[in-house]
């Protein structure tokens, strides 16, 4: 999330003297920018400027060359010789760029660097090293560890460098002693990913004077229309999007401006380098740093190309099947036909060479190098959905894509290019072009018809019309009208999230103050149904029972894709045909809504196991989405009038069925090793126990039906899974997951699971109070019945036969033994049951129990079962 530096913020808004980061966080949270963390420095001094008096190379036996240096760190920190004179400190340094005459950053004994690395005098390579000359990485300023920091090359002007004296405080010089505020930005407020946006919000919170930097920059940007005859723009730009996502062309504005005669040896100024590093970015080169700086300051992602390597026209198009790209980070990517690309046209072949994935990351060809003298600045506006999908598809969450997918100001491009050009001129001696190219098909924003009364109706705020108008104007809206309490409001270009009246109500409430919204308790109804519905009560009972069983409730995103289908061995093509596809998925690799909760719950279990959590047992209650390909098409509703009942009914008929399910996954140990005994791993019986607990809690009568192995769904173990039945209604599955599922997800062996359709289960319940069965006072009759039966007959089938034959006199039945062996013969097994008979109105005689026994034996014989002696 964005870092906020008060010194940088001052460029755009008046900040009171002595403003603390704690107070800044309080001011910003008032307008919805939450504090994530205030980062304090991990570095403590003393850290000072040092002057290298001499550096003597000393070859070592291992081939390494170290430098024995004497570094002047000022009288306060220099060593004292035997005569009481101040002399430079002796320091060992292995950096290849160490040289006499340089000014460096010296960490002295007592200093602490990131990672709790303490600097102390130590004997090494035959010398006492009394300090350390530091690199960027060691100070937490960046990733560069190729050598120590040479202040001469660190972006200081000659005058600033000359003023640096041995012993000067480098903590303050490099801003190592300053904290930073990290803020949390919601996805709809992408404009706050810039200092321009944060400064505007600080103005809204405090009333401080704010100056939009884009206004002046936009006025200075050269005109792109009506160029004199014979004068060409910097480069031709063509947008040729033949595969737009949802009909939205991927690029509606592309602004290109050249800067020629750039000095590639120019260094990034110290102030810019410092700001970039504090924002969490590496300083690479002046040209790249300028584009990153403009992005952080204004919010417009930019890219710099080597103009001499590019051949026009630039073509913005979708990728072709089979195209590949190596991005700036050196990784190879197989491109999708949905990827929007920036290409050029070598040898007149239009759009034949890929320069980068638009709005995500550039490719290796055309990048700015240490030899680049002519630069082409790209400042564009891309479709949010297209960029988001590409970034997720290729797993490149770049700073540019984070901004584009949240929405970038579509009028900012000339101003951003102007700012970048000015910086390249000032610090790189370049010459900006006055003939940029501006491909612009941006449409004007649609005005929103807004009733002032909506603020009171929706937010409960008693706000007068003038205040509402002032607030909307202050956030950048153009407000017209006001008669009859209605406004015509045109949102600003940097707020693509403002599209409906409710969005404007939210803005008014946010800036008036959420603390001003009155707290009211809705009155409870005095007539009709009060409290939770029967379904809500049962859902709560299910959740309580599983929690009491020791499972933890979770809530997962309901999105699935090819990887999930593969993990559970599902037929992806067949499943997709009956699944709901999302028009704008959060993740491009999971564009479908789940048909089973277990698929998304498995993602959560997997994440916990990968983070070292053991014995994970989670459950989730939520909806699944069952698409019917034969359902009628969902009609388009009128936008200006209230839909009719018939239209709403047609809309409802086209929606997928959305039953409520509960699913659970149990992994690891059911019982850990201890003084009471050895560990017991989770197995199918633990999942069955969970289902039985649910059944008992809600008063349902659930039975298990073990299907034949070939009929078991692919994700379940063929011999350790059962269908859960409520009478004749199938309501779910329970058992162990298939070994291939455990292997694919990294689950422990024998991991168990269950999933029940609660909507179907609740429908089988009467809703009437559970009637307790009277306890009989007559004695029971207990018998053991052992049957020899074919191995094809399941224990559940035989048990069902016994129950039906015994009738109401049967009180309980338990399978207590399964035996196979040579004594029985091939293809046979023995199933032994303990049964209890009891009558409600009399004592069972021996004749009664014998009659029951005979009915059972006769019924079992129909399955080929014989009673063993």
Tell me the role of every PLM-derived stretch:
Residues 49-91, 166, 273-274, 278, ...:
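Conserved mixed alpha/beta core segments that line enzyme active sites in large multi-domain catalysts
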């Amino acid at each position: 999330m964005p870092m906020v530096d008060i010194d940088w913020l001052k460029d755009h808004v008046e900040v009171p003297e002595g403003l603390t980061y704690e107070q800044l966080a309080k001011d910003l949270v008032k307008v919805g920018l939450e504090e994530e963390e205030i980062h304090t420095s991990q570095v403590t001094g003393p850290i000072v400027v040092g002057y290298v008096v001499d550096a003597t190379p000393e070859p070592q036996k291992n081939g390494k060359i170290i430098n024995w240096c004497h570094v002047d760190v000022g009288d306060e920190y220099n060593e004292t010789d035997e005569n009481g004179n101040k002399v430079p400190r002796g320091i060992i340094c292995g950096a290849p760029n160490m040289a006499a005459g340089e000014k460096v950053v010296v960490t002295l004994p007592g200093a602490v660097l990131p990672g709790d690395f303490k600097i102390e005098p130590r004997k090494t390579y035959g010398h006492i090293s009394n300090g350390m000359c530091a690199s960027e990485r060691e100070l937490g300023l960046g990733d560069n560890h190729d050598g120590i920091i040479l202040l001469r090359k660190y972006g200081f002007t000659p005058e600033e460098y000359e003023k640096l004296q041995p012993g000067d405080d480098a903590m303050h010089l490099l801003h190592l002693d300053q904290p930073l505020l990290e803020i949390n930005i919601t996805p709809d407020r992408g404009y706050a990913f810039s200092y321009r946006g944060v400064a505007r919000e600080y103005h809204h919170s405090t009333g401080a004077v704010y100056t939009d930097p884009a206004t002046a920059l936009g006025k200075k940007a050269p005109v792109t229309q009506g160029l004199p005859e014979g004068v060409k723009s910097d480069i031709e730009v063509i947008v040729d999007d033949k595969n737009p996502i949802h009909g939205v062309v991927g690029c509606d504005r592309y602004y290109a401006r050249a800067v020629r005669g750039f000095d590639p040896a120019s260094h990034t100024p110290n102030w810019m380098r410092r700001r970039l590093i504090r924002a969490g970015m590496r300083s690479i080169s002046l040209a790249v740093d300028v584009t990153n700086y403009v992005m952080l300051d204004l919010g417009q992602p930019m890219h710099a190309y080597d103009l001499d390597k590019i051949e026009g026209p630039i073509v913005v198009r979708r990728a072709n099947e089979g195209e590949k790209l190596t991005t700036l980070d050196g990784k190879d990517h197989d491109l999708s036909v949905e990827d929007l690309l920036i290409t050029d046209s070598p040898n007149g072949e239009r759009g034949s060479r890929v320069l980068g994935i638009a709005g995500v990351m550039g490719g290796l060809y055309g990048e700015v190098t240490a030899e680049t003298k002519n630069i082409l600045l790209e400042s564009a506006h891309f479709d949010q959905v297209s960029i988001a999908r590409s970034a997720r598809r290729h797993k490149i969450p770049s700073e540019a894509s984070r901004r584009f997918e949240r929405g970038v100001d579509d009028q900012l491009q000339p101003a951003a290019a102007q700012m970048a050009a000015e910086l390249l001129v000032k610090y790189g001696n370049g010459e900006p072009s006055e003939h940029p190219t501006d491909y612009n098909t941006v449409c004007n924003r649609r005005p929103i018809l807004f009733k002032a009364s909506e603020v009171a109706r929706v937010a409960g705020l008693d706000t007068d019309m003038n205040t509402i108008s002032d607030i909307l104007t202050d956030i950048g809206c153009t407000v017209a009208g006001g008669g009859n309490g209605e406004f015509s409001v045109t949102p600003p270009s940097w707020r693509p999230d403002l599209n409906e009246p409710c969005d404007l109500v939210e803005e008014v409430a946010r800036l008036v103050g959420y603390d001003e919204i009155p707290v009211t308790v809705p009155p409870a109804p005095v007539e009709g149904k009060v409290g939770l519905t029967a379904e809500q009560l049962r859902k709560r009972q299910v959740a309580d029972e599983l929690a009491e069983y020791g499972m933890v409730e979770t809530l997962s995103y309901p999105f699935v894709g090819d990887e999930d289908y593969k993990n559970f061995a599902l037929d992806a093509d067949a499943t997709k045909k009956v699944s709901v596809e999302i028009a704008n998925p959060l993740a491009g690799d999971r564009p479908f809504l789940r048909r089973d909760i277990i698929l998304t719950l498995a993602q959560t279990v997997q994440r916990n196991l990968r983070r070292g959590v053991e014995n994970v047992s989670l459950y989730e209650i939520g909806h699944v989405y069952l698409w019917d390909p034969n359902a009628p098409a969902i009609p388009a509703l009128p936008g200006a009038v209230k839909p009719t009942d018939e239209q709403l009914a047609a809309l409802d008929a086209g929606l997928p069925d959305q039953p409520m399910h509960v699913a659970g996954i149990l992994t690891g140990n059911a019982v850990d090793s201890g003084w009471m005994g050895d560990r017991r791993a989770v197995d199918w019986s633990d999942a069955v126990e969970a289902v039985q607990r649910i059944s008992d809690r809600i008063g349902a009568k659930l039975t298990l039906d073990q299907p034949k192995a070939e009929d078991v769904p692919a994700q379940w173990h063929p011999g350790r899974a059962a269908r859960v039945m409520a009478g004749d209604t199938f309501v779910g599955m329970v058992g162990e997951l298939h070994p291939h599922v455990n292997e694919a997800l990294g689950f422990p062996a024998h991991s168990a699971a269950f999933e029940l359709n609660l909507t179907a289960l609740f429908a089988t319940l009467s809703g009437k109070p559970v009637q307790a069965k009277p306890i009989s006072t007559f004695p029971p009759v207990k018998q053991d019945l052992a049957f020899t039966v074919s191995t094809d007959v399941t224990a559940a089938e035989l048990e069902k036969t016994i129950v039906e034959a015994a009738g109401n006199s049967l009180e309980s039945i338990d399978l207590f033994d399964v035996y196979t062996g040579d004594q029985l013969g091939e293809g046979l097994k023995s199933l032994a049951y303990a049964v209890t008979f009891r009558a409600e109105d009399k004592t069972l005689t021996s004749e009664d129990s014998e009659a029951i026994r005979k009915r059972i034996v006769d019924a079992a014989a129909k399955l080929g079962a014989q009673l063993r002696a």
